[in-house]
């Protein structure tokens, strides 16, 4: 067995199959319906919150982490990680479609975390939407990692926002949130 395979075996053994304590990890998938018939209007250059009511047919709470009932506030679409513990980590896979009114619009995404003087953001450039205007660009399958390193992150809502350089609309399919316990 190669050194790489031996190391992988040691990691998997130490983490009970690859992710913390056995039986405590899991996920909840929140499927949105609020934007299906009324897409979110995006004004060029303005950060806009992504709603998620969790009422979609594909919402799945059957595999939630042990001791966790919710990971999202479905009244506003913000992540609510107050049932987690310091040291826990989440992977978030967001699935949404942006339809720009102008070709070559720049799309950015961010999480807003913390509160008050401790407010901070995690931002990323998604890219240019350059296949034409008036067509939907679906963004999914790119997970983001957020760890609970302090109570400012753990105890406050985490907002999901997009910014498009031109006007457009957003339809949210939902967010799957995987919990990895310390």
Task: List each model region and its residues.
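Extracellular jelly-roll beta-sandwich "head" domains, especially the C-terminal globular C1q domain
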Residues: 20-85, 89-182
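Short, intrinsically disordered N-terminal pre-domain segments
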Residues: 1-16, 27, 181-182
